[in-house]
Design a protein with these regions (language model features):
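Short alpha-helical segments that sit at the start of domains
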Residues: 1-16
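Short amphipathic alpha-helical interaction segments
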Residues: 6, 38-54
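Helix-turn-helix/winged-helix DNA-binding modules
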Residues: 7, 25-26, 59
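Short, locally clustered residues in the helix-turn-helix/winged-helix DNA-binding domain
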Residues: 16-24, 57
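Short acidic, hydrophobic short linear motifs in intrinsically disordered regions
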Residues: 24-37
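A short, conserved structural fragment
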Residues: 53-63
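Accessory beta->alpha helical hairpin/"wing" motif in late/C-terminal subdomains of nucleic-acid enzymes
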Residues: 61-72
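Short, amphipathic alpha-helical interaction segments positioned at domain boundaries
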Residues: 70-89
Length: 89
């Protein structure tokens, strides 16, 4: 699926996963590096990061919160499974 056609929860998941991966590798977490991981331009990413902070999924230091990890777990367990089952991903 082209990245411009992604559903908002999928974009959120990609951002959260990107932040997590950057943290695991010890790389500096910047808007640019998150954008590269999540395949988002910086202007769209900034808007999405603000939304994720409002939702409590990312903190002000751009780190994934417990709620963010819960979101990722639910996404992979339910949403991703559903999309794959019906060939939508």
């Amino acid at each position: 699926m082209p990245f411009e056609d992604r559903w908002t929860p999928e974009v959120y998941y990609d951002i959260l996963r990107g932040i997590h991966r950057l943290g695991k590798t010890g790389k500096r977490i910047t808007v640019s590096s998150i954008g590269q991981e999540a395949l988002l331009p910086n202007n769209r990413l900034r808007n999405r990061l603000a939304e994720l902070q409002t939702l409590g999924l990312v903190d002000t230091n751009m780190l994934v919160t417990t709620a963010g990890y819960d979101f990722c777990g639910d996404y992979t367990q339910f949403v991703d499974h559903f999309l794959r089952k019906y060939g939508l991903r």
